Amino acid sequence: MSKNYLFTSESVSEGHPDKLADQISDAILDEILKQDKNARVACETLVKTGMALVAGEITTSAWVDIKELVRNVITETGYDNASKGIDGRTCSVINAIDKQSRDITQGVDRGSLEDLGAGDQGLMFGFATNETPTLMPSAIYYSHLLMRKQAELRKSGKLAWLRPDAKAQVTLAYENDKPKFIDTIVLSTQHNESISQKELHDAVIEEIVKKVIPNELITKDTKYHINPTGVFLIGGPQGDCGLTGRKIIVDTYGGAAHHGGGAFSGKDPSKVDRSGAYMGRYIAKNIVAAGLADKCEVQVAYAIGVAKPVSLMVNTFGTGKITDNQIEKLVAEVFDLRVGKIIENLDLLRPIYRKTSNYGHFGRELPEFTWEKIDKADILKSAARI
């Protein structure tokens, strides 16, 4: 790749139909974990006009009122009137949940957490870069900020015409592999009929874009596409069917890193699609925070029923202060990559997952997001002797 290029990432709001589905799946997981930390949960959701379908495999001693929970999530997300695409108070909720297969259980559950086998085979990636304060790629970082601001203004009532469904996309210009300025911002937001297109355009620029995008990244040539199709009245599940796990690039690094293909939401941490990816981020972020590299990608892979990973790879894209092989050896010494130890060390058996389902699983330094800590950075730096 040329050192001078344009790179684009997108984010979506919590009212986007796919994100509504993710929230429902993770809310169900949280309610189960509150009662049963040893539950096995794989929960998928589909939302469409006037209905939500919840399906999957769950083995637990907990009891959850699925229908009530689903309706609450839909309403809390802002869908409290059929004119918005779905009404959480009156929508149909279909429950098609079954138990986890005994064949999987016998290979995964081993008694002690330390011996827990991976819930499935798979490969996961973690990534970090020193482009932004939270060590996330710039395009996804700013895309998330735009969507969080849209939600804030909608919920506060400051822009009362905003509705829950929205998307943002940011294109950054890189020079010598460093982000220099924003080339293009695309933002589409659902709205009610009371606002004109000019008023909407001006309000989005002034109250959303200018509030979160640093002035130094905007140039006279920066292009804006605000609701470029014109009217955006029909949104949410009415405009598009929503499904759990369809925003995996929004959930991670905006396309700036590889993705193993596995979604996160609705899965308990015995599923390495989730816990392995969280561990990958934890490792990569600590490597960059330690100054071992400016940019780092970590791959781990697992076999179903096996506690230890089958492979580990570190790639610093030529930015490492020591070799990638040396960093791999340090990772193996500092981080325990057994599935049960990941769950234990990152404290993943807590009801924290609905918070992860919007605005990215990575890059938000909330107390619950233990994989965002950089508590291993000094250990890595000392071991690397740099």
UniProtKB/Swiss-Prot annotation:
Protein residues bound to ATP: H16, D165, A166, K167, D240, R246, K247, A263, K267
UniProt pathway: Amino-acid biosynthesis; S-adenosyl-L-methionine biosynthesis; S-adenosyl-L-methionine from L-methionine: step 1/1
Region (Flexible loop): 100-110
Residues the record lists as binding L-methionine: E57, Q100, D240, K271
GO CC terms in record: cytoplasm
Cofactor note: Binds 2 divalent ions per subunit.
Annotated residues for binding of K(+): E44
Catalytic activity annotation: L-methionine + ATP + H2O = S-adenosyl-L-methionine + phosphate + diphosphate
Subcellular location: Cytoplasm
Keywords (A to Z) from UniProt: ATP-binding, Cytoplasm, Magnesium, Metal-binding, Nucleotide-binding, One-carbon metabolism, Potassium, Transferase
Highest taxon in the source lineage: Bacteria
Job description of the protein: Catalyzes the formation of S-adenosylmethionine (AdoMet) from methionine and ATP. The overall synthetic reaction is composed of two sequential steps, AdoMet formation and the subsequent tripolyphosphate hydrolysis which occurs prior to release of AdoMet from the enzyme.
PANTHER family xrefs: S-ADENOSYLMETHIONINE SYNTHETASE (PTHR11964)
Subunit and interaction comment: Homotetramer; dimer of dimers.
Family from the record: Belongs to the AdoMet synthase family.
HAMAP family tied to this protein: S_AdoMet_synth1
Identification of the protein by name: S-adenosylmethionine synthase
Gene: metK
